[in-house]
Amino acid sequence: MTRKRKPTNRHRLALAGYEQSIVFSNPSYDSAIVGVSTDGRVIYDYDLMVADFMHANHCSYEDAVNFIEYNTIRSLPYVPNGPIVLRKLEEE
């Protein structure tokens, strides 16, 4: 019996008509995709990006944050209509 794979979030974006939206690649942070903005930009959850990177690369929280800040967040201003990274407000 073959087991049916759960579709990736990228696949779900394509099925919903957002195949032209810009997504991260290498790493993809697929499990951190949480939605799409009204103008069609893919929204990622920052905390889930960190968790995804830590899991995929077997690294510490600090190493994951450093990689994401330097290699991903820093590049966002140079990508027109690029992804949005959501940082949740801290609870008081």
Can you say where each PLM-predicted feature lies in the sequence?
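C-terminal alpha-helical interaction appendages
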Residues: 3-92
